Amino acid sequence: MLCVGRLGGLGARAAALPPRRAGRGILEAGIRARRVSTSWSPVGAAFNVKPQGSRLDLFGERRGLFGVPELSAPEGFHAAQEKALRKAELLVGRACSTPPGPQTVLIFDELSDSLCRVADLADFVKIAHPEPAFREAAEEACRSIGTMVEKLNTNVDLYQSLRKLLADKKLVDSLDPETRRVAELFMFDFEISGIHLDKEKRKRAVDLNVKILDLSSTFLMGANFPNKIEKHLLPEHIRRNFTSAGDHIIIDGLHAESPDDLVREAAYKIFLYPNAGQLKCLEELLSSRDLLAKLVGYSTFSHRALQGTIAKNPETVMQFLEKLSDKLSERTLKDFEMIRGMKMKLNPQNSEVMPWDPPYYSGVIRAERYNIEPSLYCPFFSLGACMEGLNILLNRLLGISLYAEQPAKGEVWSEDVRKLAVVHESEGLLGYIYCDFFQRADKPHQDCHFTIRGGRLKEDGDYQLPVVVLMLNLPRSSRSSPTLLTPGMMENLFHEMGHAMHSMLGRTRYQHVTGTRCPTDFAEVPSILMEYFANDYRVVNQFARHYQTGQPLPKNMVSRLCESKKVCAAADMQLQVFYATLDQIYHGKHPLRNSTTDILKETQEKFYGLPYVPDTAWQLRFSHLVGYGAKYYSYLMSRAVASMVWKECFLQDPFNRAAGERYRREMLAHGGGREPMLMVEGMLQKCPSVDDFVSALVSDLDLDFETFLMDSE
């Protein structure tokens, strides 16, 4: 029943409606277009100046976080959750007493919305607010709402009210496709909790769900926990690369970018050394997921997890991964040969390529072959220029403008958070984006998109505007310069804005399927598509200007940057295929035919090609097994779809308004309210096959010979 509001970095970065003109149906249902506000200012300037104290309205009335009156103090979370729980009780009563029909689905959605509005907001505040009191209060609210959701998902009367609707064929046939899909999604949530089982099995399902939550939390903590080794066991000259603690050296990561081969090797072997407790936790997590899936009627956890996705089932996922691996194998071998050549050049004594080598040596090759030192690019990518670039692109593609709006006192959690109003040229205000872009103490390091409030059509005909947060970790401005982004930071900004536009334009009738609340292998398509725009010179040329001289970024610098990303890209993609395959096997048929480490060894040798290192257990650090269990392939599949959309719709003209409107209408407007493959078909005007997806990914690896011609001129 509860939506998860966060979309973070998956993969290399580490979230049915009848066809209609996007946004029109809802507007015609009675929404009044909002006029442009006089308090809005141009977006570029807002990000290249430091916020003044006055912009936070120091003497005005305190509004509360995100304008929620109760949240002007940490204690307000208790009031907000109590209010939501009271409303939930009333709505449960209404749902159980209302005759089955479309109204049943509306009540369920309002129930979901009343809980999500507190839970999603709290989910963000508990990790992002600088004040511990706010974080703790938000954590408690998450727990309280989570308990309520567990109760609702096992409420037999509530389940029966929905089952009566879906069991009546005549009633179901009378529902519009979006309403029917939302009803089925709510039913899916119920059945995952085992509500359709007898009392004893239902209790077992609830117990397994609780156990899985606890094991997931324990596994995540263990995945990031450092390992230590006695000092005398490490060569003296590499000890200074690690943290000391008495007689021990602490290893807290892989040190993948270290130029010293021995440092990388030591970090790899020590950080990935098996921990018996973590191993037991993973085994229990996988077997508990399998037991739960079987209990509620699925042959494997993977079959359960892939319901409603583009792939639909594990067989399709494995076909996709195996075909992709076959197509990559020759290119991957060439990449490893290139890495071996560079390693031999720098370290003639030991040129064998090991798993700790590719990230470092591919970076060396990139730097040698293309002059792409980030400091050459940063002056052209001031944050204000990049935001203006996004504004230009969104305006030309979708008729959307971003305006900076002054937040009220207490509305934001840090004075450097900017608030953007998202405004359509004819439809008016679509929603708000809060930009939490800058580094600060205790802030999570991952770039993320959070849904704070989902959009939905309210009973009075007005539309509940979506509210999201984009969280990045950019350096602050200095006395002499505004915030300057590396090319990677600029691409991440475009990526996260892709999620935000999905939230703004996925204007569904129901909150349960609004914006990014869609299957995982579709959710990354809008964000990855934005990366293609960020790497196109015609787009970059609109905004990349030197912050001091105003000079545009030369075309050959953009081309070199794009081509440099293809260095060892096949090996990088092959690594993702290995991870995704391992994830599928772990969540496939149980009992597993071997230990998780033996399966890792087999899979690494078959799907990656570099040797397994004895006495290591990389799977115990694979934290994505928790959030993306059986769905790690999603990033690759989303990239394949985004690549096809780019090539077929935007490659000829990245500012094509007709293609932009079609993209909104076919892919963004439905949120999760339509089957993802139907949205892909609508956009591409064909039903892509697994071979099409594989070809799209592989063709992206081909070098663009225009770059070499330009550089040789």
Curated annotation (Swiss-Prot):
Matches recorded under Pfam families: Peptidase_M3 (PF01432)
Positions of modified residues (N6-acetyllysine): K126
InterPro entries named among the record's database cross-references: M3A_MIP, MetalloPept_cat_dom_sf, Neurolysin/TOP_dom2, Pept_M3A_M3B, Pept_M3A_M3B_dom
Top EC category: hydrolase
Residues binding Zn(2+), per UniProt: H495, H499, H502
Presequence extent in this chain: 1-35
GO cellular component: mitochondrial matrix
Subcellular location: Mitochondrion matrix
Catalytic activity: Release of an N-terminal octapeptide as second stage of processing of some proteins imported into the mitochondrion
Active site per database record: E496
Keywords for this protein: Acetylation, Calcium, Cobalt, Hydrolase, Iron, Magnesium, Manganese, Metal-binding, Metalloprotease, Mitochondrion, Protease, Transit peptide, Zinc
EC number: 3.4.24.59
GO biological process, one term: peptide metabolic process
Cofactor note: Binds 1 zinc ion.
Activity regulation: Activity is divalent cation-dependent. It is stimulated by manganese, magnesium or calcium ions and reversibly inhibited by zinc, cobalt and iron.
Keyword flag Transmembrane: no
Cofactor(s) annotated in UniProt: Zn(2+)
Quaternary structure and interacting proteins, as annotated: Monomer.
Protein name per the record: Mitochondrial intermediate peptidase
Organism, as annotated: Pongo abelii
Name of the gene this protein is made from: MIPEP
